[in-house]
Structure formats: structure tokens, C-alpha cells
Amino acid sequence: MAVPPTYADLGKSARDVFTKGYGFGLIKLDLKTKSENGLEFTSSGSANTETTKVTGSLETKYRWTEYGLTFTEKWNTDNTLGTEITVEDQLARGLKLTFDSSFSPNTGKKNAKIKTGYKREHINLGCDVDFDIAGPSIRGALVLGYEGWLAGYQMNFETAKSRVTQSNFAVGYKTDEFQLHTNVNDGTEFGGSIYQKVNKKLETAVNLAWTAGNSNTRFGIAAKYQIDPDACFSAKVNNSSLIGLGYTQTLKPGIKLTLSALLDGKNVNAGGHKLGLGLEFQA
């Protein structure tokens, strides 16, 4: 088996079917460009149709591949500045080190994180240290894989409280066309998902979740159909009768249009449905 995914990426294929291709209640514009010297620019802006709030972000990234270095600068409309420096496969094969910092001039709030990751065949290990004012917190994660089977554990330890504040466990099975994922968070939240690639054009997913002490089970099914190389259609529905529809069309190379709608199946004629529009430019 190849290198297993990180803990955060367990069950990602099913989540992507449920989340990608939708943008309910938003008008969104994304722009990605890359200069000749390898400098990447990514800017994003969105407007919420209900609150009319407009948000935006700008990111620049430069990869110094000779030394395995990546430099990233970030800014958003909350006036938060971020810097990220990553070095990969230099100190040891499979080892990734990241220094991530952010600063908000308006509030004076500062934050710094050191992230480490190590991946080899059958194992993916990560440890992050968040230097918060209240006291550092340590987040660790481990995923083991063997012949398609995956098992992972994630924990968060807060030094200020001197105790583990989060403990999550996951088990799954993965092939190229099928994925099964189950997880337990803090012993109270339970979830599971199934991903199936039916053929080259059709992907389906099912997810369910419930909380201890609550009899309500959350359930949903989703599908994505690739109509042709330039267009795809997505649909999903949950047990609350919320129906999501999405359509993505590549207008020309580097220009992609996304239309989406969220309908309340219990009150189709009552209004209150959400629409979304997205444009992505890449050069």
C-alpha cells in the first residue's frame, strides 16, 4: 500500500462529493495566476447574498524546489496577515516542517504554529504545536495503513489545562474505486461515510452521523456526474429534505463557471431557497 493519508484526509473522497461544486448563498470570484519565475498568486472574493457581507483574500506562494522550500504570504479583509515557511524532504525523506504565523494589526493578536509531518509506506504521522497566549496546545495524529485498511488516532493536549481536550479515532478501508470511513470523536460523536466510483463518469457518496444522547441521525446521499470533459452535474439530499444541486462548466481553458441551488424539499413553494454563482479564472 502507498503512503496513507493524513488523519484530516480520511474520508475525503466522500466529503468532496458532498461539498465540491456548491456555493449556496454566495457570489464568488477566484483568480489564480503563475508568473514565469514560479511565483503563484491566488485571490478570492465572495459576497453573501443574505447578509451582503463581502470578504476577500490574497495569497502569494513561491516554491524553491532546489531546497524543498515553500514561502507563502496571506492577507484577508479582516486585515489579518499570515506568513508560512515550509521545508520538505530535506532533513529526512518524508519529513515536512512548517512554521506558520499570523498577525492582526487592528487587534494586535498574534499567533504562531509549528507543524511537523512524517510519511512513509504504511504510516503518516503529524504533530502541531500552537503557541497561544493562554498556553501552548499540542495536536498529534497517527494513521496506519495495511492492504487497504486504515486506522487513525488524533488528540489535542492543552498545556494550560494539563489534560487531553480532544480524542478522536477512525477506521476505514480504501481502494481506487471504493472507500469506507468510520470515526468516533470524544466518545460522543459518531460518523461514517461510503464512497463509490461507479464508473469513469459517476461518483456516489453516503454519510451519516449521530451524537450520543440524541436520537436524531443525520443522513445524506450525494452524486457527481461528469457529463463531458468540460461539464459536470452534482446533486445531494439529506434527511431534513434539503436538496442541493450544482452545475460546473468550463467555458474555455482557464475559465470555469459554477451554478448551485439549495432547495427546501418540505417547503418548495414557500421560497427561502439559496442560489450560488462562482467564477474561477486560472492563467
From Swiss-Prot:
Segments passing through the bilayer: 26-35, 39-47, 54-64, 69-76, 80-89, 95-104, 111-120, 123-130, 137-145, 150-158, 163-175, 178-185, 189-198, 202-211, 218-227, 231-238, 242-251, 254-263, 273-282
Source organism of this protein record: Bos taurus
Key words of the record: Acetylation, Apoptosis, ATP-binding, Cell membrane, Ion transport, Isopeptide bond, Lipid transport, Lipid-binding, Membrane, Mitochondrion, Mitochondrion outer membrane, NAD, Nucleotide-binding, Phosphoprotein, Porin, Transmembrane, Transmembrane beta strand, Transport, Ubl conjugation
GO BP, one annotated term: calcium import into the mitochondrion
Protein name according to UniProt: Non-selective voltage-gated ion channel VDAC1
List of residues that carry Phosphoserine: 13, 193, 240
Residues that hold NAD(+) according to the record: 242-244, 260-264
Binding site for ATP: 12, 20
Modified sites of kind N6-succinyllysine: 20
UniProt miscellaneous comment: Dicyclohexylcarbodiimide (DCCD) binding on Glu-73 inhibits hexokinase binding in vitro.
Site feature location: Involved in ceramide and phosphatidylcholine binding. Critical for channel structural stability and gating: 73
Residues that bear N-acetylalanine: 2
Post-translational modifications reported in the UniProt record: Phosphorylation at Ser-193 by NEK1 promotes the closed conformational state preventing excessive mitochondrial membrane permeability and subsequent apoptotic cell death after injury. Phosphorylation by the AKT-GSK3B axis stabilizes the protein probably by preventing ubiquitin-mediated proteasomal degradation.
Membrane topology: Multi-pass membrane protein
Subunit structure: Homodimer and homotrimer; in response to cyclic AMP or calcium; oligomerization is required for scramblase activity. Component of the mitochondrial permeability transition pore complex (mPTPC), at least composed of SPG7, VDAC1 and PPIF. Interacts with SPG7, NIPSNAP2 and SLC25A30. Interacts with hexokinases including HK1. The HK1-VDAC1 complex interacts with ATF2. Interacts with BCL2L1. Interacts with BAK1. Interacts with RTL10/BOP (via BH3 domain). Interacts with amyloid-beta and APP; induces VDAC1 dephosphorylation. Interacts with TMEM41B. Interacts with BCAP31.
GO cellular component terms given for this protein: membrane; membrane raft; mitochondrial outer membrane; mitochondrial permeability transition pore complex; mitochondrion; plasma membrane
Annotated positions of the N6-acetyllysine modification: 20, 109, 252, 266
Tissues where this protein is expressed: Predominantly in brain astrocytes.
CDD domains referenced in this protein's UniProt entry, alphabetically: Porin3_VDAC
Domain notes for this protein: Consists mainly of a membrane-spanning beta-barrel formed by 19 beta-strands. The helical N-terminus folds back into the pore opening and plays a role in voltage-gated channel activity.
Functional description taken from the UniProt entry: Non-selective voltage-gated ion channel that mediates the transport of anions and cations through the mitochondrion outer membrane and plasma membrane. The channel at the outer mitochondrial membrane allows diffusion of small hydrophilic molecules; in the plasma membrane it is involved in cell volume regulation and apoptosis. It adopts an open conformation at low or zero membrane potential and a closed conformation at potentials above 30-40 mV. The open state has a weak anion selectivity whereas the closed state is cation-selective.
Residue numbers carrying Phosphothreonine: 19, 107
